[in-house]
Structure formats: structure tokens, C-alpha cells
Amino acid sequence: MVVRKKKKSRKLRGRTRSMGWGRIGQHRKSGARGGFGAVGFHKHKWIWVLKYAPNWYGKHGFTRPPETIYGVYSINVGELDELAKHLVSKNLAYREEGKIVIDVTSMGFNKVLGRGKVTLPLKIITKSISKRAREKITAVGGEVVVIGEKQQ
């Protein structure tokens, strides 16, 4: 587009009360831009709304109730392996048939991921588990119990 008017310099010319902006108050506060923020969207800024924000007004979409939204709270098998003996001493886990049984759902987690090394035979009780985590646990003689999944 062709520039019709040279932009006024932002520099404070002359260090006077108005700094080149005419009457005192012409360049002060929000009167020069039609109000703070979204003021005037239904009045003097309506054309701007139609052009740049056509979906500003009206209802859009649906908000799910918070109780139906479940977050993924995950822990890695490497962390469980490191914490296993500590969890037994704190009575958050127990030993059964040579394995350390850890119920991650009682600790607030709902998924087990596969990062880290597994050195101890663990029996993990969880709501969901990644393929890699399951492989690592069973490779050292461990066991995985997924809540809601049929046992073979």
C-alpha cells in the first residue's frame, strides 16, 4: 500500500509538555485509541470486529464437566525400581512370592511408562501401562496387573 502520511516520530521532540502531540492530553491514556481493551466492540469498533474477529460474539462449543476429564498421571519403571525398597520400608509396597508388589494407583498414578532400567522383579498394579514398560518388567521376571483388563 502507498503510505499517505509519514508516521509521527516516537521520539520526545523538544522535551515540552506535549512533546509534539499538540494539546496536552491528546496523546495521553486511552482516549486516542477509543478506550481500553475490548471497549466499543459493539459500538465504534464494530467494523473491526466484523473484519478481524467475526466469532467474538455468540456461543461456541461445549465445555465438558470437570469430573469427566481424567488427566494422565504417569511414573517411569526406572523410578519405581529405584523407589521399590524405600516403598516397602514405608509400607506403600510389600513382598509377595519373591516380587515387590507396588500398587501405583494408591500413590496417585494411573499410567506406567518405560523409561529407565528395571533390575528387581516387580509386580505392578496399574490402570494402564506402555508396551515398553511391560516388556522391561516381564524381562526381569516381574508381572503386570492392569485394573479392568482380563487376565490370561
UniProtKB/Swiss-Prot annotation:
Listed name of the protein: Large ribosomal subunit protein uL15
> Entry's Gene3D superfamilies?
3.100.10.10, 4.10.990.10
Tell me which UniProt keywords the record has, alphabetically: Ribonucleoprotein, Ribosomal protein, RNA-binding, rRNA-binding
Could you tell me the gene encoding this protein? rpl15
* Quaternary structure (record): Part of the 50S ribosomal subunit.
* Ribosomal protein found in the keyword field: yes
Q: Which InterPro entries match?
A: Rbsml_uL15_N, Ribosomal_uL15, Ribosomal_uL15/eL18, Ribosomal_uL15/eL18_sf, Ribosomal_uL15_CS
Q: What does this protein do?
A: Binds to the 23S rRNA.
One Gene Ontology MF term: structural constituent of ribosome
Please give the superkingdom of this protein's source.
Archaea
Which PANTHER family does this entry report, sorted A to Z? 60S RIBOSOMAL PROTEIN L27A, LARGE RIBOSOMAL SUBUNIT PROTEIN UL15
User: A Gene Ontology CC term for this entry?
Assistant: cytosolic large ribosomal subunit
UniProt cross-references to PROSITE patterns, sorted A to Z:
RIBOSOMAL_L15
Q: Which organism is it from?
A: Staphylothermus marinus (strain ATCC 43588 / DSM 3639 / JCM 9404 / F1)
Per the record, the similarity remark reads: Belongs to the universal ribosomal protein uL15 family.
Tell me one GO biological process term.
translation
